[in-house]
Amino acid sequence: MKSIEELYKRALELKNKGMSDKEISTELHLSVNTVTWLLSKEFLKEGAVQDVKIGWRSVGVFGSRIISIAEIMSDIIREEMNKNSFEVDSILGIAINGIPYATLVSYLMDKELIVYRPHPARKEGVFSSNFASVEGKRVVIIDDVASTGETMRRTITDVTKEGGKPVLCVLLASKMSVNDLNGVPVRSLIRTQVIGGS
């Protein structure tokens, strides 16, 4: 586990490279509020921010481990399909960390692959033209970690605007306490919760 000082140094290093707080939060798997808090050196003051750092490097360094997680995600998707009687046409991976999982889930379930890149500053993201389109498709959205759900909400909105129907969101880990976003069910392998504190 990284210390707060190490996180501060890494956040500052990324900021000095020109990354926005949103981009830094994605890279460090922290909420934007936590990144802002770190960069303002508020952690030097009394009290602590309420956030949890999620790191999954032990999974990400080997494709065999990623496919094991993708198999669990596929099982969750099938469970939801059976429980809620819906079909799936496509699997969408949110860049960058959702793409490896979505690619393998797409392969395991024999579904089309959609790649979506959220924009760190604007509301609308971009769908990669090298992969499947969303129009007329029932879509499962996959990402690694959701802190506030903002990226997932924007993805749901953009899929809908492009004529697709988001049917499920699947995450490796969720810091959110909600079970759906914009009416779309959210399932995660791991759900974190901060208990106690001030």
Curated annotation (Swiss-Prot):
Q: Which UniProt keywords apply?
A: DNA-binding, Transcription, Transcription regulation
Annotated GO biological process: pyrimidine nucleobase biosynthetic process; regulation of gene expression; UMP biosynthetic process
GO MF, one example: DNA binding
Origin superkingdom = Archaea
InterPro entries per the UniProt record, alphabetical: GfcR-like, PRibTrfase_dom, PRTase-like
**Is Magnesium set as a keyword in this record?**
no
Alphabetized SUPFAM superfamilies for the sequence:
PRTase-like (SSF53271)
Q: Which CDD domains match?
A: PRTases_typeI
Keyword presence, Aminoacyl-tRNA synthetase: no
Please name the Pfam families in this protein's record.
Pribosyltran (PF00156)
The family assignment reads:
Belongs to the purine/pyrimidine phosphoribosyltransferase family. GfcR subfamily.
UniProt comment concerning the protein's domains: Contains an N-terminal DNA-binding winged helix-turn-helix domain and a C-terminal regulatory domain (or effector binding domain) resembling phosphoribosyltransferase (PRT) domain.
Instruction: Supply the HAMAP family for this chain.
Output: GfcR
The protein's name:
Transcriptional regulator GfcR
